[in-house]
UniProtKB/Swiss-Prot annotation:
Family the entry assigns: Belongs to the glycosyl hydrolase 5 (cellulase A) family.
Name of the featured protein: Endoglucanase B
Signal peptide: 1-21
Residue ranges, annotated region (Disordered): 23-66
Gene Ontology process terms (BP): cellulose catabolic process
Phylogenetic placement of the source organism: Bacteria, Bacillati, Bacillota, Clostridia, Eubacteriales
Amino acid sequence: MKLKRIAALLTAAVMSVGVMASCGGSKSDDKSKADTKSAAETSGAEGDSSESEEIPVSQTHTNDPMTVTSAKDLVAKMSNGWNLGNTMDATGEGLESEISWLPTKVYTNKFMIDMLPEAGFNVLRIPVSWGNHLIDNNYTIDPAWMDRVQEIVNYGIDDGMYVILNTHHEEWYMPKPSEKDGDIEELKAIWSQIADRFKGYDEHLIFEGLNEPRLRGEGAEWTGTSEAREIINEYEKAFVETVRASGGNNGDRCLMITGYAASSGYNNLSAIELPEDSDKLIISVHAYLPYSFALDTKGTDKYDPEDTAIPTLFESLNELFISRDIPVIVGEFGSMNKDNIDDRVKCLDDYLGNAAKYDIPCVWWDNYARIGNGENFGLLNRQEYDWYFPKLMDVFKKYAESDPSAAAA
């Protein structure tokens, strides 16, 4: 691993030589710039693979053969997942927004993504915020932003991973009657462009229509109302119809559907109404449990194995969906670093163990944050190409190796 890390750093340095020369950078800046630049930063002027140098990213994967499969069968091939958090979902403008929320300004590159399968992950979720990258009143997505998103999608696809692409911090949707029609118009406009760009990809690419849709800033923001839940069901219907009408492989693509706030609460889960479709829909839920241990910055740093939050979640998911042959993916989970690695290991083992009973893949939220008093979910050291917490990685590998169907994918 050490040799591979050194090779990755050297190759990254070689890739950025042309960029630095054109910008007049000094030799003393070489190492830091090599560590923080990716080829895509130059909007295709430099590529980080021979393929991207020869073929524009927009012309890749235009006609991949599609293996038509049910969502249940597809999810059965998944093991552990990893979120590229606080990256493409940052809410700034321009290509620089990719690094605006990161503690060290490291652009995503192929070497990072190559580390995931080796560590026991075969699912890559790429949260993307699109609203600040629209260039006109017709909701046209900035072509440079679309290209950069596609480049990162290709990193995972070319590694044989299952890639989940979503709309993330979209401040423009608010599930209220007064906002509904405008929200659906924008939702359809954005997803029609995403679906068209990626319609040639095979079943390894999954679309997730919404991320934690909720009444932002209101008293019921995280609990929801019956009215808001119904409107979100309408949003999801519009998402599915838009993708299905876009042609290519999208008629058979598996899609992820979320309820209010992607909540794991029973009331919100039970209010999900799946749009009329084939057997290619997957439920998406987010669950940082037990809350006081996993997500509350002022909560406990001790994990109580007698806490029932985790088993109760998976029992509810089984009752509402799995038992009805509707697959589920936990699209976000994790426990933040409170200098309590042994307790985090126990929690992760319990979480993945309960999920495995029902063949539910879980996707860790990695926001590249590790120290301080905030939400520190970082696992991958994106600058040094190693893992911050090897004991946690051992747990992921344990469950990846115990899932022969996922390993065979």
